[in-house]
Structure formats: C-alpha cells, structure tokens
C-alpha cells in the first residue's frame, strides 16, 4: 500500500510525457536554408535585452539543427533551425548571475522563437533545458 501512491504518481507522469513528433506533423513545413549568420543574429538579439551585453558571456553550444516544437497551452507551435546557447549576464550590482540555456529558432536567417531568453524564465527555461538536451548539449548548471 505504501508504494501505491508513488507508483500511481509515476504512471500519471508517464502518461503526460509527449509522444515523439510524427512525420505528419512536420510534413510540408518550410524550414528554409540552414542559417549562416545565426551567431551574429543571436548577439544582436541579446545586445538589446541583456543588462550588460558587452560583458555577458555567450557560449554557442550547438550548430543549427531542424527542430519542431508542438503547440501546448503555454507555447505556440514553432519550427525552424534551432541552436542552443548558454548565457551568463550581470545583475544590477555588476555580478555575474550564472549561466542559463537559451534556444533560438531560425527561419530564413531570422529569429522566429526564443525559449529561455532574458525575461523568459519558468516554462521557457524548462523548454530551453529540454531542447538543448535534444540538440546534444545538455545544460549542467
């Protein structure tokens, strides 16, 4: 009996796990060409959103890879060439806050979605961690 609750909770959690993306979901989507200037675009995006963009440390963890993000209650469907970046910005006192993962989606050399970026903590941070792992760069922080 004492194992019934944990087992029930585990089964309920497993039932919530998303199913793998199917070919039907991604069929016909135009990802566009693989981005060439993604690092410049990311730096430009961050330069107007970070507290101290000149001092921030930006680590490009992966090269762009095709990725599809399903629509859920708190996020729209997005697709494109995704890349994982770790960012360490300074706080208002000038101290580094620590690295956090960010995933950028590109189509036709433009950023179309950001998960985990500045101001997108909570669910966005969870998406970024999961997507970085899927892209081959698990966040260890």
Residue ranges and their predicted role:
Residues 17-141:
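Cystatin/cathelin-like cysteine-protease inhibitor module
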Residues 9-10, 125:
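Residue-level signal for mature regions of secreted extracellular proteins and peptides
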Residues 1-6:
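Bacterial N-terminal signal peptides that target proteins for export
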Residues 8-9, 87:
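Exposed boundary/loop context
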Residues 12-15:
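C-terminal motif of bacterial Sec signal peptides marking the signal peptidase cleavage site
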């Amino acid at each position: 009996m004492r194992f019934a609750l944990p087992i029930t909770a585990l089964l309920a959690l497993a039932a919530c796990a998303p199913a793998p993306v199917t070919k039907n979901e991604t069929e016909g989507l135009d990802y566009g060409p693989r981005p060439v200037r993604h690092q410049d675009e990311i730096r430009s995006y961050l330069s107007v959103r970070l507290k101290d963009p000149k001092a921030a440390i930006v680590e490009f963890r992966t090269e762009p890879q095709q990725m599809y993000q399903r629509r859920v209650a708190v996020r729209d469907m997005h697709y494109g060439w995704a890349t994982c970046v770790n960012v360490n910005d300074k706080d208002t006192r000038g101290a580094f806050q620590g690295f956090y993962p960010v995933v950028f989606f590109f189509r036709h050399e433009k950023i179309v979605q950001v998960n985990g970026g500045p101001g997108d903590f909570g669910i966005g941070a969870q998406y970024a961690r999961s997507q970085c792992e899927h892209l081959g760069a698990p966040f260890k922080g």
